């Protein structure tokens, strides 16, 4: 029976099953179908793997028929299993650098792929060898390399298998061995049985999936599997990572509220507000995860992070995590003060013209609402702009109803403010509450009636009684804003003035130098310099978009670049507005539900008894006050009005006043 095996020629070595057709023809029927693929190395290996699985062994005598031939150039070695074939190619043909026989060029069949490392060539050899240790846990399909499995797992991202949570006693029939032939994944993809696979743990880095039953043996981890994460993995690691990210945002929000209470930054500065909000936008805040209300803040019930899956050993679910209450928003006074600061920040974002200056572009009509018209038609949060403008304008009324003449461009030197554009600005120092000012105390001076330029320095802004917001603004946006139709933006860094002024100025100069008398007395070079000087000035100082000799392509390019910058600034502006709205809704919801400690009331009650002993400690002084009835009657109404403020000083003053006439 061994003669047919000895007479096989090397040309037929590409079909390992064809060598065994002579002594077991009635048992196997698939080799005639595979023998036609001997010309191509890739198809030969694929057919060999298919034939090895399509003909399941009946007894132990049929095992030697599954030999796999090595198609390396000049090699006719045969291996019984794909694992041994892979080890043979890696050790015999690839070699190692330590043994001085390292070969980084693949010579399998007609392949001549060259790599730079041994790990790369060994990973490439998996393409030729029918070794598929990496199996998909969702469909059961096997792959040769871990990167192929990673790409395949991404195809299951939108599959309902990832979203559907399994029942406790259910099994997925498509995942276990045997498969579901109706879906096209036959048992051919699972041909590595435990008896044939001496290294079953090569491709299972995560062990059995958590919804498997516990009768499967545990498998050790292997770093070659890679970092493949599934949506069904609701284990401790995923829950811990989610908890850590939520806690980082939670701590950042608490620190932000603490900075507001301690006035670490100026709420009237658009640059400071934008920089402070930028740190919150990059984190996953618990407020933004579940709508305007926080997910972990009030802690009405324990929140379980992690768990949810059915592990093989029946482990208990992960413990519930609790986030402590915010230390900076415990009392009612804290909530009220923080809400006032947030309102100032909201007014700064909506009505301050520094949002244009800090971005370096002039955004027409973005921060100015005239009557019932609203020019902020894109990238605006729904139903927030008109109420915000209304509240920002009316909130400054009860404090100090002194209208500040405000120029939307912020350039009274070139564009004088008109009465039609003036409105009460929420960011003006005279309209801010006296309890929340950070700027110098001389706000009520006469200079506070005039708005400041965005290009003003810090010393100028402080001397004028305005916040230092303008120090962060570049000296730009010196142009008109009434281009409401085309919404044109101008880039910063160049001076801009109106077009009629630029055209009218050179014309009388040209007419004055074109006289015949001047031409006779003046050399011909001076008339050439007259029209060249305005061009040089316009090229260096004036925006090229306003000069008549500018190239149209450059003008379009400049306008397009400015438009892109303005759109990005619009997106950032909208994100800041939405974040402020979320924070204000969160504070308002806590105030409405009464979710705050009673420390504020306790402190007020505790202060009144302290005031009493202070008064009783001065009891020696109150005895002479009780004797004259004339001094006691005017003291009671004053003490009844402000009993908490100065109880001791009033007693001393009254005692002194009562003794002085005597």
UniProtKB/Swiss-Prot annotation:
Subcellular location(s) per record: Cytoplasm; Nucleus
Sequence ranges of Basic and acidic residues compositional bias: 498-523, 597-619
Primary location: cytoplasm
PTM comment text: Activated by C-terminal proteolytic cleavage by signaling protease (probably palB/RIM13) at neutral to alkaline ambient pH.
UniProt feature, compositional bias: Polar residues: 404-438
Entries under InterPro entries matching the protein: pacC/RIM101, Znf_C2H2_sf, Znf_C2H2_type
GO cellular component labels: cytoplasm; nucleus
Extent of motif YPX[LI] motif 2: 646-649
Presence of the UniProt keyword Cytoplasm in the record: yes
Keyword Cytoplasm on entry: yes
Low complexity compositional bias, start-end: 7-43
Motif (YPX[LI] motif 1): 450-453
A GO molecular-function descriptor: DNA binding
Subunit structure: Binds to DNA. Interacts with palA, which binds to the two YPX[LI] motifs and is required for proteolytic processing.
Family statement drawn from the similarity comment of this UniProt entry: Belongs to the pacC/RIM101 family.
Record function comment: Transcription factor that mediates regulation of both acid- and alkaline-expressed genes in response to ambient pH. At alkaline ambient pH, activates transcription of alkaline-expressed genes (including pacC itself) and represses transcription of acid-expressed genes.
Protein name: pH-response transcription factor pacC/RIM101
Species this chain originates from: Aspergillus oryzae (strain ATCC 42149 / RIB 40)
